[in-house]
Amino acid sequence: MIRPMRKDDYSKVYELWLSCKGMGLNDVDDSENGISRFLNRNPSTCFVAEIKGELIGAIMAGNDGRRGYIYHTAVHPSHQNRGIGSSLVNTVLEALKQQGISKTALVVFDRNKNGNAFWEKLGFTERNDLIYRNKSLVDMTRIET
């Protein structure tokens, strides 16, 4: 079952993220406070997947009014390759479409081979003409998964 993500899902979602290799987490944006802020801004584009009450998948997305952005897509390793990730993505894409968004983007680490294959299978294309840049405005610590 896929349902909207709630703030009280945080501890289970964070535990899920830690179980998945290749997640890009940090101690500021992915803290309980950081995720709470994200959910306040994007309440209708963040979802979890459950089986018999066990949280086994999650996806977060938002938009800037023009483009959608997908973040932190994860399915517990013991439940991967069963269509759960695809269902989460399709759910979030439909939610973005309902908000008038016509295109979406995401970032995947180059070393995340399984993640890149997953997104390619779903029709997401790689852009070789772009360089992704970012700048931290506060001190934060990266959390490796």
Where are these regions (language model features)?
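A short helix-loop-beta-strand connector motif used in the catalytic cores of GNAT acetyltransferases and
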Residues: S36-V48, Y69
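Conserved GNAT acetyl-CoA-binding A-motif
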Residues: L96-V108
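A conserved beta-turn-beta hairpin within the catalytic core of GNAT-like acetyltransferases
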Residues: G62-Y71, Q80, E126-L130
